[in-house]
A protein has these predicted regions:
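Concave beta-strand-loop units of leucine-rich repeat
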Residues: 33-43, 53-64, 73-84, 92-104, ...
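N-terminal capping/linker segments that flank leucine-rich repeat
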Residues: 2-49
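Non-core capping and flanking segments associated with repeat-based/extracellular domains
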Residues: 19, 109, 129, 134, ...
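Hydrophobic anchor residues at the C-terminal helix/turn of individual leucine-rich repeat
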Residues: 28, 50-51, 70-71, 90-91, ...
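Intrinsic-disorder/low-complexity peptide segments enriched for small residues
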Residues: 4-5, 9-10, 69, 129, ...
């Protein structure tokens, strides 16, 4: 009975059975000459605190559920169709953040973002007051019911 249950879980969630934390050694296998880290479709479940990425960070289609405090991305963040649920305050992204189809429910206060914010097709319920987006903000097909007070969008609002 238990074996059948375990087999079913492994078949339904193949990434859960073989996922692990990205460490400083395995990170080297995914960095290109420009400082970009591409983890798309890789079996990682978490990122280390204080990770510094000189270029772009791509965690699309991964089991990574949270962006740790102190994460510094020198380029943009791609997290489309990922398991990402939580972004910790203190994360810095110099470019845009594309979270289309991720599992994010709220965008925290204290995240530095230098470009657009795409939250399309997410279970997003709220945004922080006085959020400033230096590009477009997309909340298409989200269950968000109202926009926060003091919202500033320098681009278009979708």
């Amino acid at each position: 009975m238990f074996r059948g249950f375990l087999l079913t879980i492994c078949l339904l969630c193949p990434w859960a059975a073989n996922s692990y934390e990205l460490d400083s050694y395995s990170k080297l296998n995914h960095v290109d000459n420009y400082g970009n880290i591409d983890l798309r479709n890789k079996p990682y479940s978490s990122l280390p605190s204080g990770l510094v990425v000189k270029g772009n960070l791509n965690i699309s289609k991964t089991a990574i559920t949270k962006l740790p405090k102190g994460l510094d991305v020198g380029g943009s963040l791609e997290a489309t169709n990922s398991s990402l649920k939580k972004v910790m305050p203190g994360v810095s992204i110099k470019g845009y953040a594309n979270l289309l189809g991720s599992q994010i429910e709220s965008w925290p206060k204290g995240v530095k973002l230098g470009g657009y914010l795409n939250l399309t097709d997410t279970p997003l319920k709220r945004l922080p007051n006085r959020l400033k987006v230096k590009g477009d903000l997309s909340v298409i097909r989200t269950p968000i019911e109202s926009l926060p007070e003091g919202l500033v969008v320098e681009g278009n609002l979708y």
